[in-house]
């Protein structure tokens, strides 16, 4: 497989990595927890189930991943931040028990294979002023709780923007792969990060031991933490409904429904053969933010045609079983979304019996008008980069193409 290769790093990043030993940056589970306690003056991390995946992940970082110095600094900050949020969230729920009674009613979840339009669908539904979507700034720094009066002007938005700019300086090509910004809606894996039962940790790092644990783990604790975060975020800044998103939900729909039995789920559909080369290059670039030694072959083997087929078959089987009623599902095709986004979104509103006023349509159209495709440069990839046989892969997905009326793009 031919995989996207990064360009040279900025001189300052190279200088830091060459002159400072990453071993100087301690990644020890107990020391990280102690730092979070000292930072907050709090001691209760809440549900003890997080300790096992947290420790496995930290051990995996130390034993399996060759972090460069900048990468070690970034992950250390991420881990202390996640632990800090756990402490603050637990304390808030004790001091303000009314937060635990906040009702998360019929949230809309968007999921599908990666690169099938989940992000733009999420952003457009979030552009409806009645909707609430978790933004990067309030997930990175959720305390104090966001408030309606200052939501659009909170100083944490600018702080989050600066953090994201740092990522894009370390790997400049990263900017062209995704819309990024402090006030951009984020994936649920980030909301779930503090549970340590989340693709957030596996998606940024090549950590086989943690991945092995995660793939066999009960995902419900991740969604329980997710719901606690939503209760916190909506306490002083509510919306009519939550709109949420993550391709990772394709592998954990049962767990999602265990915590959100009334969830309404939008499944995005696109030719899997268009998806494959794009996903691998994004995984590679994300890992490269934190390590110079990224195994391209391992990345390619992590997300394969077999992986896609398993996820799609799992979705279809769940729906066929009746455990996920069709009244709670909507199928959104990428081709229709690209052709006429507002009309395509209209189908979601109609299916879920949500009113769709002109003000919502206008807000979404304005978002589209201010976000032309390719605005940040192109993320270029081609099926030929995979080294796979096109006809064989098309046959693999023939049932999927027919059932969900998906166009061939490769």
Question: Where are the language model's segments positioned?
Answer:
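Short His-Asn-centered micro-motif
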Residues: 111-113, 243-247, 269, 334
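Pre-Walker A adenine-sensing motif
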Residues: 91-101
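Post-Walker A helix-loop "phosphate-sensing" segment adjacent to the P-loop in P-loop NTPases
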Residues: 127-137
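Conserved phosphate-donor/acceptor-positioning beta-strand/loop module used by diverse small-molecule
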Residues: 245, 256-281
